[in-house]
């Protein structure tokens, strides 16, 4: 494709140059004829363009015009007009691509063939016009000169164009040959590569064919060996089938003999068992019965011995429990007596101390009670006490209280805390007396008495004797550690067990008071007896006998 395009471009270039020369020559020839056949009046004007046209030829053919110096000057003057005419002819002529040599011959042959006809027609017209108008000899001479110059220029132009075309054709031919050689080399290289690839492929195919031949030969040998093996296996299995059949027949005969013998043995064994089973069953039943009787007798003897032993231990335990219960009752009675004696002593000592001061307080509280009434809904709020906790069930059944001096001590202890508390707003020091009494009792036939409320008594320093401080604290210690007792009941206050001893401690007087102590004396803490009572646990109940316990804490601050 590239070579065809180069050819077309080269042909177009040659054709353009060829067409420009032929068209220029033909146009000049027509102008000469036009100026040669004119009227006499126009001869002078026609002669000047002919000279100008004659001056163009030496410009194009310098080799021929170089002998005449006059023509050289004329050619220099006529260069501009000739260039304009040639440019006009080039732009007006059409361009047709063709081979340069064929274009040259075809254009000139056609030009030569057309030029005589045009000359003949023009000569005829000239003759006709000449008959009418006279033509001078000078004009004929000029025309002859111009025609000579034109023919010589045409010859030189044709020869130069032919030489150019020849050179161009040779160059084009060389280029085409070079391109064709390059293409040929590329094609040869491609073909050589293909040949080498095909040779390698041929070698690979030969190798694969050889391998396939080897595989085929190996398979054929393996198939032959397999056929031989199959034939051997067929013969072997035929022999084996016959051998197995013969052994099977022998084994079936043995099985039949064994089955026959077993059936005979079963029949014999069933007959023997039916005979022997009756006697054996009776013997076994007698033996089992005798053994069971012996075991039952032995078990009954063992259980009787164990029962007697356990009943004796139970009696001993009951006697010990009763003895311990009696000791406990005696110990509790002695403890109550000792405790009440101590309480009575403390109460008497406290009453002697506060005898003079308490009379006014008791009278004051009695007046308040009478004013509020026995069934009054509330107390005076000035008594700095928590009324919700001022009452406590402290009643004790009358039949449970001890007789004699114990009863008197209990009566005095229960009557003393019932006094109302008194406070003095202007006092800087305060003394308080807290006497909580709790008596808990348990009895199966005892009926509870009506409850009596009490409140802690607060006595100010104005009601006491100056310079005397008595602080008493009673603590109890448990003498027995057993927690569970049978057939007894025990009432415990707080977390303290029944008291075995009473310890009274006296403290030195406190003379330095601080603001918190004064505030505490002014607003004493209310005791909630209900919160200090724990549930009593019943350890055993004895009808007609009750147990009671009282704990008292006294604190006097001067």
From Swiss-Prot:
Residues that bear Phosphothreonine: 23
Modification(s) after translation: Hyperphosphorylated during recruitment to procentrioles in G2/M phase.
Keywords: Acetylation, Cell cycle, Coiled coil, Cytoplasm, Cytoskeleton, Phosphoprotein, Repeat
Basic and acidic residues bias: start-end ranges: 1-21
One annotated GO molecular function: identical protein binding
Annotated Polar residues bias: 83-92, 385-400, 547-558
Subcellular location: Cytoplasm, Cytoskeleton, Microtubule organizing center, Centrosome; Cytoplasm, Cytoskeleton, Microtubule organizing center, Centrosome, Centriole
Residue ranges of coiled coil: 175-209, 300-340
Centrin-binding (CBR) repeats (start-end): 126-157, 215-246, 247-279
GO biological process, one term: negative regulation of centriole elongation
A cellular-component GO term for this protein: cytoplasm
Disordered: annotated span: 1-25, 53-102, 364-400, 532-558
Modified residues (Phosphoserine): 81, 93, 548
Modified residues (N6-acetyllysine): 522
Family the UniProt entry places it in: Belongs to the POC5 family.
Quaternary structure note: Interacts with CETN2 and CETN3. Forms a microtubule-associated complex with POC1B, CETN2 and FAM161A. Interacts with CCDC15.
Function as written in the Swiss-Prot or TrEMBL entry: Essential for the assembly of the distal half of centrioles, required for centriole elongation. Acts as a negative regulator of centriole elongation.
Designated name of the protein: Centrosomal protein POC5
Organism: Mus musculus (Mouse)
Upper lineage: Eukaryota, Metazoa, Chordata, Craniata, Vertebrata
């Amino acid at each position: 494709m590239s070579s065809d395009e180069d050819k077309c471009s080269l042909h177009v270039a040659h054709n353009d140059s060829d067409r420009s020369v032929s068209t220029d020559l033909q146009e000049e020839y027509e102008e000469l004829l036009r100026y040669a056949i004119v009227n006499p009046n126009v001869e002078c004007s026609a002669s000047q363009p002919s000279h100008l046209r004659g001056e163009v030829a030496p410009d194009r053919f310098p080799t021929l015009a170089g002998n005449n110096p006059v023509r050289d000057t004329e050619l220099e003057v006529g260069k501009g007009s000739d260039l304009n005419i040639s440019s006009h002819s080039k732009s007006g002529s059409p361009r047709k691509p063709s081979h340069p040599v064929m274009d040259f011959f075809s254009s000139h042959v056609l030009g030569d063939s057309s030029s005589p006809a045009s000359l003949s027609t023009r000569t005829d017209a000239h003759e006709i016009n000449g008959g009418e108008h006279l033509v001078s000899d000078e004009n004929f001479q000029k025309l002859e000169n111009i025609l000579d110059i034109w023919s010589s220029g045409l010859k030189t132009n044709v020869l130069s164009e032919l030489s150019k075309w020849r050179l161009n054709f040779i160059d084009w031919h060389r280029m085409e040959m070079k391109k064709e050689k390059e293409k040929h080399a590329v094609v040869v290289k491609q073909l050589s590569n293909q040949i080498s690839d095909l040779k390698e492929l041929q070698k690979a195919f030969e190798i694969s064919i050889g391998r396939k031949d080897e595989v085929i030969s190996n398979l054929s040998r393996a198939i032959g060996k397999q056929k031989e093996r199959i034939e051997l296996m067929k013969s072997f299995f035929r022999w084996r089938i016959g051998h197995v059949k013969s052994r099977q027949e022998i084994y079936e005969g043995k099985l039949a003999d064994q089955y026959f013998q077993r059936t005979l043995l079963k029949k014999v064994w069933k007959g023997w068992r039916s005979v022997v089973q009756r006697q054996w069953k009776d013997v076994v039943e007698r033996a089992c019965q005798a053994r069971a009787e012996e075991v039952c007798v032995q078990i009954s003897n063992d259980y009787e011995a164990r029962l007697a032993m356990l009943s004796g231990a139970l009696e001993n335990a009951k006697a010990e429990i009763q003895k311990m219960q009696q000791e406990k009752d005696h110990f509790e009675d002695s403890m109550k007596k000792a405790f009440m004696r101590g309480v009575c002593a403390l109460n008497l000592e406290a009453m002697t101390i506060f005898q003079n001061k308490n009379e006014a307080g008791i009278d004051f509280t009695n007046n308040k009670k009478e004013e509020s009434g026995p069934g009054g809904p509330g107390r005076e709020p000035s008594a700095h006490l928590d009324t919700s906790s001022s009452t406590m069930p402290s009643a004790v059944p009358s039949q449970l209280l001890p007789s004699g001096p114990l009863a008197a001590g209990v009566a005095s202890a229960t009557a003393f805390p019932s006094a109302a508390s008194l406070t003095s707003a202007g006092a800087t020091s305060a003394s308080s007396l807290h006497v909580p009494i709790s008596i808990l009792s348990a009895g199966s036939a005892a009926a509870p008495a009506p409850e009596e409320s009490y409140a802690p008594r607060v006595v100010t320093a104005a009601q006491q004797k100056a310079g005397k401080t008595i602080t008493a604290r009673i603590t109890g210690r448990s003498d027995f550690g057993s927690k569970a007792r049978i057939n007894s009941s025990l009432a415990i206050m707080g977390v303290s067990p029944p008291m075995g001893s009473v310890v009274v401690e006296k403290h030195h007087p406190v003379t330095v008071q601080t603001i918190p102590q004064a505030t505490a004396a002014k607003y004493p803490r209310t005791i909630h007896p209900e919160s200090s009572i724990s549930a009593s646990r019943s350890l055993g109940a004895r009808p007609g006998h009750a147990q009671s316990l009282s704990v008292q804490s006294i604190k006097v601050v001067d």
